[in-house]
From Swiss-Prot:
<dbReference type="Pfam" id="PF03054">
    <property type="entry name" value="tRNA_Me_trans"/>
</dbReference>
<feature type="disulfide bond" description="Alternate">
    <location>
        <begin position="113"/>
        <end position="210"/>
    </location>
</feature>
<dbReference type="InterPro" id="IPR023382">
    <property type="entry name" value="MnmA-like_central_sf"/>
</dbReference>
<dbReference type="GO" id="GO:0005737">
    <property type="term" value="C:cytoplasm"/>
</dbReference>
<dbReference type="GO" id="GO:0005524">
    <property type="term" value="F:ATP binding"/>
</dbReference>
<feature type="binding site">
    <location>
        <begin position="19"/>
        <end position="26"/>
    </location>
    <ligand>
        <name>ATP</name>
    </ligand>
</feature>
<protein>
    <recommendedName>
        <fullName>tRNA-specific 2-thiouridylase MnmA</fullName>
        <ecNumber>2.8.1.13</ecNumber>
    </recommendedName>
</protein>
<keyword id="KW-0820">tRNA-binding</keyword>
<feature type="binding site">
    <location>
        <position position="137"/>
    </location>
    <ligand>
        <name>ATP</name>
    </ligand>
</feature>
<dbReference type="InterPro" id="IPR004506">
    <property type="entry name" value="MnmA-like"/>
</dbReference>
<keyword id="KW-0067">ATP-binding</keyword>
<feature type="binding site">
    <location>
        <position position="45"/>
    </location>
    <ligand>
        <name>ATP</name>
    </ligand>
</feature>
<dbReference type="Pfam" id="PF20259">
    <property type="entry name" value="tRNA_Me_trans_M"/>
</dbReference>
<keyword id="KW-0547">Nucleotide-binding</keyword>
<dbReference type="InterPro" id="IPR046884">
    <property type="entry name" value="MnmA-like_central"/>
</dbReference>
<keyword id="KW-0694">RNA-binding</keyword>
<dbReference type="InterPro" id="IPR046885">
    <property type="entry name" value="MnmA-like_C"/>
</dbReference>
Amino acid sequence: MLNSLELEGRPQDTRVVVAMSGGVDSSVTAALLKSEGYDVVGITLQLYDHGAATHRKGACCAGQDIHDARNVAERLGIPHYVLDYENRFRETVIENFADSYASGETPVPCIECNRLVKFRDLLATARELGAAALATGHYVASHRMAGGSRALLCAADADRDQSYFLFATTREQLDFLRFPLGDMTKPQTRELARSFGLSVADKHDSQDICFVPTGRYTDIISQLKPNAMVSGDIVDLDGHVIGHHDGIVHFTVGQRRGLGIASGAPLYVLSLDAANRRVVVGPREALKMHRIILRDVNWIGDGALDRAVGAGLELFVRVRSTRKPQPAWLRAIDGRYEIELVAGEEGVSPGQACVFYDGLEGQARVLGGGFIARAMARRANEIAAQNGTPAQPLAAELRG
């Protein structure tokens, strides 16, 4: 007989570790499991020096958050532990974040935190404590499939769906993880928090880049990678210098504001050339990319990745967390994986994730994904074939 977490055994005989950030979502997760009779243990990770962020709203795992998590644990009558992961977090997330920006990418630190800290080290700690599962307050769902393995699904609340940030979860991790809020909406979660009498029921939601107390990510980069703040040129697609900048870390692909260039038509950041400290700008139509080269691809769909891809796999991809999935093809070419975007996408930035889904609507299944290494416009001969005109060289076909 399976319990509500789709595990063998009665709830009272099943230990579950809950990752408690001090926010309403993880607090309700702990409260729900406790109310169902599970043996719940709360763990909070201290991820960075929170002195400067103690009074900042929306910072995950800052001093106030640890205090809130402890209060919730006391309210629920569950054991609670705070683990110092500052060094691990700095080495695997913060330093990688700075390196990525310095190389001209736009990173997603929450993915790295989930992949390298929460779902690796914390999961290992949960096993050491004898837990049968690690539960989090993420808005995603996971369901047991016929063969016993688990599928990762989008949240029922599309506005809160966090599947983009969890694409790098491995199959082994997915089998151990549980997401009790996946079929709920945020208002329902807050209402449950009130019904449980939790002090965090109306607490502000946490924000990305939790380790930037001032809200200025360039402060972190200037400390760790001062060379990334070196000035350089802003150039057009033909390489003509049309302006100057104070460091490529101030820019991201698709950016329009803050260029400091007088132009008759709007200009957008098309790519960042870190080696030459150049920011390439151009018209909006030059932003549309149709091909993406991926790195560090993770596959959690059925079977082996190469067999699933075959000559080409039709799926849907999301290239930014705020965008809806779009139709695409995944192909294996010359020992690497590439995405062909059927309709093209603007502002495809190296360093962001490209996440695979099996559908557009509802609780689509997450099939995996990879990080964007490069994005390209269609080849000149493809455009010529579409327009019925002779092929012409494409200026700056390669972005990133």
